[in-house]
Amino acid sequence: EYALQLAEEACAAGVDEVQFDYVRYPDADHSVLVFDGGSTEQTRVATITGFLAEAKERVGPRCQTAADIFGFVTSVSNDGGIGHQVEALAEVTDVLSPMVYPNHWGPGWFGYTSPEDHPGGVIDQSMRNVLERTAGRTTIRPWLQDFGGYGPAEVRAQIDAADSLGLGWMLWNAGSVFTEGGIPLADEVSTPSQVPPPVEETRPPSGFWDVPAANGYGQAI
């Protein structure tokens, strides 16, 4: 309720979008956690989408309702144990921002031994997955990696991958120190259109598509 009241206050003050961060269940072993009503995929998804649906009702049409989601849920069919089910989230948000930082993906994702070494490929494939699954029901605007040793080339590769799919983007650096050489000028990027090229088959290698709760970005199961 407190978060919803803050969102309403921000919208009344003229903010045009409220992005809810870390709206999820703990990414931990649920066998040692206790929740009112239990913790099944159905209850988790219902809880998270229920909160966002109420937020959208209370702040709209003054504000857009946005949510950060874990990046790996773009490419798994379940909720990842945290209540993030992409198709359901698309119905209750105006904007979804997957945190698809390449250094968060384990060996084997998208066919890469080291996904961190393929920043453009990780963004391209994960975004194609989420665009196919949401089918225009919400705007996709990913968080991209500007930390962990990435320089201008790696940052720009991610931006170019998002831009090529008609997507806007945001950069994350915990200290708000950004790689200036990797950020394009305004006339070097497209106006977001979210009209991507035909989606190609990008399912992860065998063993990844149905990720058990709390496994997340980990190695092959």
Language-model-derived ranges and their functions:
Residues E1-E9:
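Active-site-adjacent "subsite" loops/lids of carbohydrate-active enzymes
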Residues Y2, S39-T47, G80-H84, S114-V122, ...:
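Alpha-helix N-cap and loop-to-helix initiation/capping positions
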Residues A7-E8, V45-K56, V86, I123-L131, ...:
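Generic structural signal for well-ordered alpha-helices
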Residues V15, V23, A28, V100-Y101, ...:
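Flexible loop residues that form catalytic
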Residues Q19-P26, T43-I82, G136-G149:
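Aromatic-lined carbohydrate-recognition surfaces of secreted/lumenal glycan-active proteins
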Residues P26-T43:
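Aromatic- and acidic-residue-enriched carbohydrate-binding clefts of CAZyme catalytic domains
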Residues T93-P107, E116-G207, P212:
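Substrate-binding cleft of secreted/luminal carbohydrate-active enzymes
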